[in-house]
Amino acid sequence: MNNIPKLKFKYLTLEETSDILSWTLKDTDNILSVKEGTLFLYPELKRLTKEDNIKDIIQDRYNNFIKENNNLREEYTTIWNEYNDKYMLEISNYFNIKWPKEYKEISVGIGLIPVCPRYIKEKAFDIHKKNKEELIDTCMHELCHFLFFEKCKEIYPNWKYEDFDSPSLLWYLSEIIIDPILNSDGIQKIYKHKFKCYDIFYNVEIDNINLLDKIISIYKNNSIETAIKESYNYLKEHEEEFIRKCNNK
């Protein structure tokens, strides 16, 4: 019998929120621009000094967010449960791998944050406030990452957790393949929606060939095992040019 994970929504604590914001303020990734997003959401952090405590600065806004959105956990659970089982089974079929038994429950933290970080070891990810369409998009996006990395463990036995985080090529690939996988026929039958990866990937050309056109073709015309190997090898072959163009350098 297939294991079908469930999502458990919760509110991020003040400390968890502070830790995420602290991480984003140190980030220099041109693809995500998470620092910019944090300063837009929290302009008061532009004046942050080494002596300041982020928790103290954001505490009032955190408390107001929790007070004003105390029904989000139940609302999100109701919205997502309509799709959970069908999606979990279909994405499992696509990757030709069962959800590992450790994935009984996946924690989803809700907070006043500008990003949606995921935690592979902890089997969790975080989100900010979203409408129904954004919520489903984000949950399907993040869950696709989890099973993609499980498939990579199977294909690449010498894997390590660092392979699944930025700036590794497998991390880049995990973000790019959101387009061909979530726009596949099986997923679209469950939720009709145009899924997109990060905008910057659509503008990358290698040897005068559009990156997304190349990757989409690979996933459309091959088994998932072959597609992952071929797309990863393609990025490795053009790694220097790919990274440079992704970072606008």
Segments predicted by a language model, with ranges:
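Post-HExxH zinc-binding segment in Zn-dependent metallohydrolases
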Residues: 10-12, 152, 158-207
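Hydrophobic (often cysteine-bearing) scaffold residues that line and stabilize catalytic clefts
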Residues: 83, 136, 170, 174
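Auxiliary, metal-adjacent structural segments of Zn-dependent hydrolase domains
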Residues: 59-120, 184-191
